[in-house]
């Protein structure tokens, strides 16, 4: 079937004939889009800051919205709700429902009645034949057969028509990846800014109506009508012609709506806002073409900037804060764990400051645990120190005795010597006889010999030490002041160097550089480092931290809170419906009736301007399978009403025929002898049959008719007659008489054959 065979509707022809020759002036009624920057080409003005226009997109903030939406700053579980909102399933189901409804509603009653009569003729069945065959003595049986015959035709017709209409629906695809009126882009604009920039495309001369852009299709591309193979069905059903005509008209109309609009890309459009006139204008940054802007949620002007009424505007701050916390935690992990920093705190002995002298004396004296009694020099120095602390000359005897006890051990013990002999320091004293041990004699000789020599030397030595300690106390204070100044200068130098390093770091460098990469990494200087502070440590300084402890700020609670914010914001803003199981676990997130009205209605009526859309789908229909959707739509159309009426009339015709047969047989004579002979031959009890409306009682009074016109005879039929007539044996089926009721009135056939 070609496009020329698709004739316009009669009402459109009548409207065209009535208005032919009459000039109709169309008034430009203001649309909602006109308040958002839609202007005719002759009224376009120059967009500039002097005219009060402010660029509201692209800005760093609006581009950040898109980055957040794409997961550039992290992704949480709650953000997955946006995938359910962005799904085009609801829009596709709405388009399919529209095409199905418009197509099936185009059915004509005359065509449907012809198809039904054709079916009866092909089966060789009529209402009179059904009544004669199955309704002679059981009306219910005949009615049941008639209903089953119509149900069979109803089911086969429904399957054929739905397959036929589904092929028409397949001509239009709303999920094209290169579609200009993409539903996904429409949702992205709403989530980011709450407004949708778009362009109205003009049809090129000679272009073919196609669901894609207005363009001339190649010769090898099949036409729109070739999507439907109507040869078989159109030759068998009268109703197929009207369905095909109306179905293709619905597809062409939707194709024209989608091909005449283009939702502009997020990264290729400049949006300007005029606060005084409350207008928004969109301009393509590559072509310079101007478009209009559908404002779904009005933005707010604040101090020279615009606050958008959108989910991303409300949640952007929390996303940035959580992202900064995660970056901080990553830097802490890199700086405090890997690489390892080693802090060295040992100083040389000669560079340890004023306290070194006392420590050296302690070392020489052997007071330390590691140097206790380890060398003869330390014991000698200890002897000198002890001699300095003497209060009188007599204490030298005890000092020398203790020194000799530590050093000589048993070297001089055992032998005796006469100390009265010359050489033991007793020449000037009165000689005393007697021998003394060698050790005691040596001790006495040493004491007498070194007493005079060391006393003056030791006094002068410790006097010098006291003078040095007094002088070094002032130098120690000056040294500490200089060290504090040097520490302060080093801190300033470190801050300046860090600022210079941060400024030289590339913005795109990753903070998660590999450990040990050193200055080559994006963080700069994260290699292994040895910090030498030996020259900075004081006498009582020590290593406070070796940087081996792992410290990472916890951000799990913040991430969970951000996930809940995403979930609540998207569900409540777009009115989505959460489906859970009996345990309260989430199964899916789907469109509700409110979200369908919020999102689908502006898309089809304001963006696509589809005027013959019909009712919006419900949330149950949005997620049905294609077959279930077709069956549900089939029951809502006028075709179903026509089929119900045909079924009712056909059953009524069968009942009418049964009543006519019963009234005819009521007047026929009955031969009781012949019936009795048949029963005797079979040897079985006879089965009694009554006219409709007669009582079964054997009483003669019960056999009398209600009109009082005498008695009616009971008819007896043999089993052979029951077999010949094809009556059912089941008593529940064959016995449906109305006890004590009047005969069923005749139904006249008001429907022409």
From Swiss-Prot:
An annotated GO cellular component: virion component
InterPro entries, per the entry: Herpes_Portal
Comp. bias regions, Low complexity: 507-518
Annotated region described as Disordered, given as residue ranges: 1-44, 498-523, 668-753
Transmembrane segments: none
Start-end of Basic residues biased regions: 707-726
Biased composition (Basic and acidic residues): 1-30, 681-706
Residue ranges of the region described as Putative leucine zipper motif: 454-475
Keywords: Disulfide bond, Host nucleus, Viral genome packaging, Viral release from host cell, Virion
Domain of life the protein comes from: Viruses
Cellular localization per UniProt: Virion; Host nucleus
GO biological process: chromosome organization
Function description: Forms a portal in the viral capsid through which viral DNA is translocated during DNA packaging. Assembles as a dodecamer at a single fivefold axe of the T=16 icosahedric capsid. Binds to the molecular motor that translocates the viral DNA, termed terminase.
Family: Belongs to the herpesviridae portal protein family.
Subunit note: Homododecamerizes. Interacts with terminase subunits TRM1 and TRM3.
Full protein name: Portal protein
Organism name: Equine herpesvirus 1 (strain Ab4p)
